UniProtKB/Swiss-Prot annotation:
One of its GO terms (cellular component) is ribonuclease P complex. It catalyses: Endonucleolytic cleavage of RNA, removing 5'-extranucleotides from tRNA precursor. It is an enzyme of class 3 (hydrolase). One of its GO terms (biological process) is tRNA 5'-leader removal. Keywords: Endonuclease, Hydrolase, Nuclease, RNA-binding, tRNA processing. Belongs to the RnpA family. InterPro entries: Ribosomal_Su5_D2-typ_SF, Ribsml_uS5_D2-typ_fold_subgr, RNase_P, RNase_P_CS. It comes from Pseudomonas putida (strain GB-1). This is Ribonuclease P protein component. NCBIfam families: rnpA (TIGR00188).
């Protein structure tokens, strides 16, 4: 069974890792007030990065709540996302959505992302940015 923790190795930590996902995403899943970008990472576990700016979500309380919900949802669904670097970009209005609706929305988005993954043969030529290079 895959552990459901959110340890340091499951986070995108450096600007270089974020840039790799932004520059060449292999998967894009637009959602209500957010965008999920994903890229193969060549590892056996997924990694998550969050982008929630003050322009999109004004109050720090709301930004922190969103980050907590996003991390928790990722943690519970990471078994279907193995081998991906994922960046979630928040957009205006995301802070006004209630927690149950957000949880439901993220469940659907993770399923869409898992379904939209390219086949392993298609990604054999693209090399991921792994955490040992940092």
């Amino acid at each position: 069974m895959v552990s459901q923790d959110f340890s340091r190795e499951k986070r995108l930590l450096t600007p270089r890792h974020f840039k790799a996902v932004f520059d060449s995403p292999t998967g894009k899943v637009p959602g209500k007030n957010l965008l999920i970008l994903a890229r193969e990472n060549g590892l056996d576990h997924p990694r998550l990065g969050l982008v929630i700016g003050k322009k999109s979500v004004k109050l720090a309380v709301q930004r922190n709540r969103l980050k907590r919900l996003m991390r928790d949802s990722f943690r519970l669904n990471q078994q279907s996302l193995a081998g991906l670097d994922i960046v979630i970009v928040a957009r205006k209005g995301l802070g006004e959505i209630e927690n149950p609706e957000l949880h439901q929305h993220f469940g659907k988005l993770w399923k869409r992302l898992a379904r939209s993954r390219p086949t392993p043969a298609a990604t054999a030529n693209s090399a991921g940015v792994d955490s040992q290079d940092a």
